[in-house]
Amino acid sequence: MAPKKKGGGKKKKKDDGAEPPHDGSWERAVESGTWEKPVTDLPDANTWPTWGALRERVLTACREIKINNTASLRDAFANELVKLSPPELTLIDLRGSSNLHNFNLSPMTTCPKLTDLDLSECAGLDYVLLQSQTVRSVNLRKNPAITKALIHCPRLNKLSITDCPALETLMLWTDELTELDLTGCNNLSVVKLQCPNLLDSKIPPLKVAPQHVKPSHPPIASLLKENLTTAAHKAAADKEALAGVKDTSDSIIPHVFRPF
C-alpha cells in the first residue's frame, strides 16, 4: 500500500484577480426599475473594469431614482444621470443631497419621460437649469444657498420654491402653471415670468440693484489729458518766442565766446 502524501495534497491558491461578488441590489434595481440606495452602492468601474457597463445598465433601467439625505451625491452623479438620459425614468428625487451644487437638465429632450423632480433641502445647491418638455412637478423648497433658477418646462403645473433666502434670479417659462409662491425668497432682484395661465402669485418686493453715480468732479484721465494739452501749448509758445529773439549786439566776438 502506497504511503499517504503528507499535507493532504496541494491546496488551490486563491485567485486574487477574480471579479468581486455583485451586490444583489443591482439586479433587483434592474427588475424593479427603482434605485433607493446611496450612490456609493452602485457598481463602479474603478472597482472592476466591466462594472462601468453594469452601472449604466442599472441606471438606464430605472423608472425612479430616490437618493435622499446623503453627502456622497455630488455634481458628477447628476451630470452622469442627465448624460445617460434613462428612457423610462419618471422620477428623480435627490432631496437632502448636501454636496450637490449645480443641477443642469438640458436639452429639452433629456430624460424623455421625466415628470417629477425633487431637489429640496440641498444645503449646497447654488444653480439650477431645467429644460424639459415632460416635467410637471419641481420641488426646490428650503435651498438656503441657491442664487439662480432658470426653468423652461412648458408642461410644468406645480412649482415649490419657498424659503430660498439667497435666491436672486428666477426665470420661468411654463404654459400650465397657475400658482406661484415665492414666500421666503427675500433676496430676489430679477424675476422674469412667461406664464400665460398664472392666476395667483406671491412675489416679495424686488431688491433694486445699486446704480453707479457719476462723480461731480472730472475724471482723472480728463484732468491728465487737459494738463498735457496745456503743457504742449506752452512748450510750443516758448519755442516760437525763442525763435523770434534776434541778437542786436554789435560785438564782433561770437556770442558763444562772450564772457558772462
Curated annotation (Swiss-Prot):
Cited InterPro entries: LRR_dom_sf
Main location: cytoplasm
Keywords in alphabetical order: Cell projection, Cilium, Cytoplasm, Cytoskeleton, Flagellum
SUPFAM superfamilies hit by this protein: RNI-like
Subcellular location: Cytoplasm, Cytoskeleton, Flagellum axoneme
Family annotation (Gene3D superfamilies): Ribonuclease Inhibitor
Domain of life of the source: Eukaryota
GO cellular component, one term: axoneme
Region of interest: Disordered: 1-43
Comp. bias regions, Basic residues: 1-13
Biased composition (Basic and acidic residues): 14-30
Free-text function comment from the UniProt entry: Component of the nexin-dynein regulatory complex (N-DRC), a key regulator of ciliary/flagellar motility which maintains the alignment and integrity of the distal axoneme and regulates microtubule sliding in motile axonemes.
Quaternary structure annotation from Swiss-Prot or TrEMBL: Component of the nexin-dynein regulatory complex (N-DRC).
Protein family according to the UniProt entry: Belongs to the DRC6 family.
Protein name, as recorded: Dynein regulatory complex subunit 6
